[in-house]
Amino acid sequence: MSVPIFRTVKELRAAVADWRRDGLRVGVVPTMGALHEGHLSLVRAALANTDRVIVTLFVNPKQFNNAGDLAAYPRTEKEDAAKLAPLGAHMLYAPDGAEMYPNGFSTTVSVSGVSEGLCGAFRPGHFDGVATVVTKLLLQTGADLAFFGEKDFQQLHVVRRLTRDLDIPTQIIACPTVREADGLALSSRNVRLSADDRRNAPKLAEALFAAAGRLAEGTPVAEVLPNARDAILAAGYQEVEYLELRGEDDLAPLSGLDRPARLLVAAWIGGVRLIDNLPVAQPA
């Protein structure tokens, strides 16, 4: 059985209104397509916690600050729909650019604080694009719950902040990062890795897990992070954009483990930018 594909806000809202009349809870999983097991785990979580699940598919041009990255982003709607069908998702909402940003569109949602630093420092305008499209998707779907992966941890904080600040009643549900057997965090960008780079790519997670372990043992942050950065570069990565310890709850920079923390990294390998993060246990 195929998943119904909706293209317009009008169609979407009519379907959701029918569900509401039946007293059904609605979940949404926002994606840019090129679905992998990480996305599908979000869909399964949504199906387990709501009555009707909308998966959105929109490659959002406003969150790309590099035209080449936007052009190279995989677009696989037919394959995505085929992956969703056996799971039982109730709708694939796949608007085009004109539907999402009609002529004259002139509003940007900008979340300060948690959007600054980390990815925000290297991708100017990215989180404005994320915040704008997510705000629209939450308002369009009227979902009770929205499901996001922890792999995009800064994005998760941005989305939580905008729902609080704008009084959007959708509850944001964080789901664990899904990894390949070799540890590499799943990403739609992984398909762009060459065979050699794919072999080396898991060393990013390896360095992250090793660093998190050393921090949990009490090794000073000022010693652990430079060593981890060196290990990533030695593994075949060309650049480490950032490798930082931040507060789990507010993304504030940390110099020690005096509260729940998260280790976050972004690095380039073979022209592909990969991100990852891990929670760090406090020393016993």
UniProtKB/Swiss-Prot annotation:
(R)-pantoate binds at residues 63, 155. Its main location: cytoplasm. Keywords: ATP-binding, Cytoplasm, Ligase, Nucleotide-binding, Pantothenate biosynthesis. Its EC number is 6.3.2.1. The active site is at residue 39. One of its GO terms (cellular component) is cytosol. It catalyses: (R)-pantoate + beta-alanine + ATP = (R)-pantothenate + AMP + diphosphate + H(+). GO terms for molecular function: ATP binding; pantoate-beta-alanine ligase activity. ATP binds at residues 32-39, 149-152, 178, 186-189. Pathway: Cofactor biosynthesis; (R)-pantothenate biosynthesis; (R)-pantothenate from (R)-pantoate and beta-alanine: step 1/1. InterPro entries: Pantoate_ligase, Pantoate_ligase_C, Rossmann-like_a/b/a_fold. Gene3D superfamilies: HUPs, Pantoate-beta-alanine ligase, C-terminal domain. Beta-alanine binds at residue 63. Pfam families: Pantoate_ligase. GO terms for biological process: pantothenate biosynthetic process. It is found in: Cytoplasm. NCBIfam families: panC. PANTHER family: CYTIDYLATE KINASE/PANTOATE-BETA-ALANINE LIGASE, PANTOATE--BETA-ALANINE LIGASE. Catalyzes the condensation of pantoate with beta-alanine in an ATP-dependent reaction via a pantoyl-adenylate intermediate. Homodimer. Belongs to the pantothenate synthetase family. HAMAP family: PanC. The reaction proceeds by a bi uni uni bi ping pong mechanism. This is Pantothenate synthetase. The lineage of its organism: Bacteria, Pseudomonadati, Pseudomonadota, Alphaproteobacteria, Hyphomicrobiales.
